[in-house]
Curated annotation (Swiss-Prot):
It comes from Rhodopseudomonas palustris (strain ATCC BAA-98 / CGA009). Belongs to the UPF0311 family. This is UPF0311 protein RPA1785. Pfam families: DUF3237 (PF11578). It comes from the Bacteria. PANTHER family: UPF0311 PROTEIN BLR7842 (PTHR37315:SF1).
Length: 153
């Protein structure tokens, strides 16, 4: 018998995003690039600002399943810079996904949006971010993405 898989909420990343740039149909779907403009990180024992660079690189598959790969960084209030590489998928009813693409509001509970963030930092206070696996439950809004990050125990 293996250990029970459990998670614990640790913090929320709110990333402000810019306008979508499309590279068009690439044979496997439509490639989109969405700049990350800034934001905040808030949680128990960690808080800071999302730095104003990086992007979310997406492929929208023909069935509207969206594969995401975001690369960016945040700086904690005590000066640690943390690099983030976050991969995931977003899926739901086609019409609701199209509403999201148009910037229209959609109830996040009806869209499956999960991620696997990975963190890197040399700061001793945050080495634990590189010693565990994390998963995220996310919501897309017109001007931001909100990710609740959970540590896999």
């Amino acid at each position: 018998m293996t250990p029970t898989l459990e998670t614990k909420y640790v913090f929320t990343i709110t990333a402000r995003i810019g306008d979508v740039t499309s590279a068009g149909e690439i044979g496997t779907g439509v490639r989109r690039i969405i700049p990350i403009l800034g934001g905040e990180v808030k949680g128990e024992g960690i808080s800071g600002q999302v730095l104003p660079f990086g992007a979310d690189f997406q492929i929208i598959r023909p069935n509207e399943l969206i594969e995401l790969e975001a690369k960016y960084a945040f700086e904690t209030d005590d000066g640690a810079v943390v690099y983030v590489e976050n991969v995931g998928i977003r899926f739901g009813p086609v019409e609701l996904l199209r509403k999201l693409k148009r910037g229209e509001p959609v109830d996040p509970k009806v869209i499956y949006f999960r991620t696997r963030p990975r963190f890197e930092t040399g700061h001793p206070n945050y080495q634990w971010l590189m010693q565990y696996l994390f998963v995220g439950s996310a919501a897309r809004h017109a001007d931001r993405v909100v990710i609740d990050v959970h540590q896999v125990l």
